[in-house]
Amino acid sequence: EMCIRDRAIELGLDVVKFFPAEQSGGLAKIKAMAAPYVNMKFMPTGGVNAKNLTSYLDFPKIIACGGSWMVPGDLINAGEWDKIEQLTREAVQTMLGFELAHVGVNAENEEEAVKAANRFAFIFGMPAKVGNSSVFAGSALEVMKTPYLGKNGHIAVKTNYIERAVNYLSTVLGVEFNEESAKRDAKGNLKAIYLKEEIGGFAVHLVQK
């Protein structure tokens, strides 16, 4: 086992397939192997399915997962490509886990933002929290202190893996992103980014869960 990984490094590989993943100890085994090999990433296959997919992908050393649950043999033999496509799309959606995070409202100034957020918070029994550039009412409504992106405001969509979401939306669906809007943490990890387009007068941004 150690020799195989050392051999992979000697060959200049920094990504290796781990198969059969579940039968070989699953995520715990990968974490144990990853500890001494800081630059090695893994692609587990074998026993990976819709239920355990995100538990694997949550580990930063997992670059991708594979699984035959998306392409069952009986559907291949029957030529039911539409069903295979559906299963694959469902796997992608399970991975990305898109959900509404909050709605953003543009206010003219801080006073108006506080007033609007406080009123919303009062009516619906939510806490109001003043931030640097906006005021939140609970987690559902964000009122901007100055007009920002979006004619009508913005809609935030949260995702399990924002980097993977950006890659999927841009390469597969052709969605364009406003790179200047990207926000990153101290380690350089992407935390939020806006789409270039507005939808229904709303700017849209992704946010990391």
Over which residues does each language-model region extend?
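Conserved, mostly hydrophobic/aromatic
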Residues: V16, Y56, A91
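N-terminal beta-strand motif that seeds the catalytic metal site of vicinal oxygen chelate
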Residues: V92-A117, G150-V157
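C-terminal helical cap(s) of enzyme catalytic domains, especially alpha/beta-barrels
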Residues: D74-L96
